[in-house]
């Protein structure tokens, strides 16, 4: 029972780390990466769909993405969706869509760093909330006399160690992202 709680908490914390990585992927660094356009939604036959479902996104060079729509009729809709996204990108349209990424200014890098820190802080809060939920479950098991006080205390210490491990991992990933952002 206690082991199930530990495994469940560890799985939930791992999902939080995966979510953090997805959040970090949206933070633009100086280099082109297809995941920059992951959040762009394109109108397609009456509903909004992710860009990667209507086009291939590739890298032309270190500062340029290439978007090749599966259907030629989608070029203008994709162009418009990229322009209207909050990414500040201006695509160049021909048969395919080229998306040059402007060089990041120092100010933009600082703003991106703030966004990355915010994502990391949200991940830490989520991890701590998972810990709180599991500790609450342990307390209710103790109250129902399904586990002893010693078991509850030992399991609580184990959960704290797991939490510390994942919070340290969030800090490590944030430091790596900040270093990547500040690299010119």
From Swiss-Prot:
One GO location term (cellular component): cytosol
Keyword entries, A-Z: Cytoplasm, Protein biosynthesis
Family: Belongs to the RRF family.
Source domain of life: Bacteria
GO BP annotations listed: cytoplasmic translational termination
Role summary: Responsible for the release of ribosomes from messenger RNA at the termination of protein biosynthesis. May increase the efficiency of translation by recycling ribosomes from one round of translation to another.
Organism: Acinetobacter baylyi (strain ATCC 33305 / BD413 / ADP1)
Localization (cell): Cytoplasm
Recorded GO MF terms: ribosomal large subunit binding
Highest classification ranks of the organism: Bacteria, Pseudomonadati, Pseudomonadota, Gammaproteobacteria, Moraxellales
Record protein name field: Ribosome-recycling factor
KW Ion transport (keyword) present: no
Main subcellular location of this protein, as a coarse class: cytoplasm
Pfam families linked: RRF
InterPro entries in UniProt: Ribosome_recyc_fac, Ribosome_recyc_fac_dom, RRF_sf
